[in-house]
Amino acid sequence: MTGSARFQKGIRRWAASAAAMALALAGPAGADGLSVIGFDDAVHHWQLKRGSDYPRHDESDVRAIADNLLLMQRNHGGWVQNRDPLQVMSAGDVKQLLAEKGETQGSFDNRNVFTQIEYLMGAFVLTGEQQYREAATRGLDYLLRNQFETCGGWPHSVPAQAAYQSRLTVADEVFSGPLTLLRRISEARAPFDAFDAETRATAKAALARGEDCLLRLQVRQGDTLTGWAGQYDPMTLAPMGGRTFELTAIVSQETVAILDYLMSIESPSPEVIASVAGAAEWLRAVQIEGWRLETVPLQSEQAYRYHNAKFDRQLVADPGARPLWARFYDIADNTPVLANRDGMRVERFDQIDPERRTGYSWYGNWASTLLDRDFPAWRCRVLGTTSEGAPCT
């Protein structure tokens, strides 16, 4: 999972990718390529460890990118996370990926699986190559096969290599990404109009289970609806933490991504309407005013296990600052939840170790666009009134 600020827009990026793909499919085959925005998170993580000094295919080279996705796809139909599908593969790279085909590991983390399925279907429509549709179908089968029966979400990774990876996961679009994919398939939106009616019906049933689960997972404080945790026990559906520094909490960033998805539903049910309104009100109630997050350059670069840092971060009092949100909020009292890798909660941002302070996003402006623009527009579309109850003009 990532705390990187470049992925704050959550499902908006996925929607942008889908829109760009639809435009590409409407034009001459292969003229402009297909959007690769959906792979940004994977590429970011790949380059964090390996740098960016390696040859990459041009974004317009659809066949080369799709062929890489075929090469990276495991025999079970899924993919491991954090690979760059635009990488120009050496003979050694190809040999290694072929040798890994039979390995069991796969992951839905960091916008994985649903992005590959969409790209491969787009490549099929553009090129007519049946192997791309077949690979997308295997990927979809993998996604459907790993949907929890107890509640229609997905685990972080299969098989789990750490305790948190077996949990039902909302973080990093592990939930909202597949739901968006399933909705687009069930509604036969391009490029998924190339799927048959049986596949669309299967996707629609999985979508219904997923949306029902999503509403069940929304955290309540008494009778008040709030946001969503990052992970849950798949049997009891109790909120849980992730990695050692990701304690059990309501997660503002993931709540925004979930709301982006729920607000995309054309004709929402009363339950969805109540869910969106409750979560938006909670986000407004927990916003932090009078503070800004400042980046401070370091005299020398600091090397850590998972990243190198040329800066530190600090919270600075500023009466004119835009609202901030803590990433994590206490389920009981909505106080910000901060912690170190040892799993110990701390009270202040400056008590977080520099490695986690620079390698994770503890504060951000995640809900600003949603509250200022997207939620009011949704309210007018669905309810016909402003937040003050006045008719929309």
Positions of PLM-derived features:
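Long, well-ordered core segments of solenoidal/helical folds
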Residues: 64-77, 135-152, 204-223, 275-292
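Terminal, non-catalytic domain-edge segments
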Residues: 32-65, 184-209, 235-242, 246, ...
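Sec/Tat signal peptide C-region and signal peptidase I cleavage site
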Residues: 27-31
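Bacterial N-terminal signal peptides that target proteins for export
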Residues: 3-18
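Eukaryote-skewed repeat-based solenoidal scaffolds used as protein-protein interaction platforms
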Residues: 133, 137-140, 144, 158, ...
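N-terminal carbohydrate-binding/catalytic regions of secreted carbohydrate-active enzymes
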Residues: 59, 63-114
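Bacterial N-terminal signal peptides
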Residues: 16-26
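A cross-kingdom feature marking solvent-exposed beta-strand/loop segments within repeated
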Residues: 87-108, 151-170, 235-247
